[in-house]
Amino acid sequence: MRPISGRITSNYGYRVNPVTGEYKLHKGIDYAGNYGDPIKASKSGVVEYSGWISGYGNTIILGHWNGVQTLYPHAQTLNVSVGEKVSQGDVIATVGSTGNSTGPHLHFEIRINGQPVDPLQYIPY
């Protein structure tokens, strides 16, 4: 399921980074949002990380199955702790603009065995 209801503002793929000006891989998709909007777990899983990551700001990482992870960076608040089990649709964080960000949004990534993949291949847009 989609983690947030906002429209997609940036797709997965190579682009000019709006903060650094570098041309590089955008490892996820960006959804427009407002400060405090709920961010929901796209799939059931276990919280592997809940804290600050350089560039990503406040971030939740959920582990799912067979090396699949979902990442939820730039959050305003983090509502879950490491080791906590979450169900699909649970509110795990709220939209913010922490880390390298130009405004409130959710950057959403899916990684398989540590490698980013296009989230739109796995969830509806």
Model-derived features with residue positions:
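Catalytic cores of peptidoglycan-degrading enzymes
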Residues: 2-125
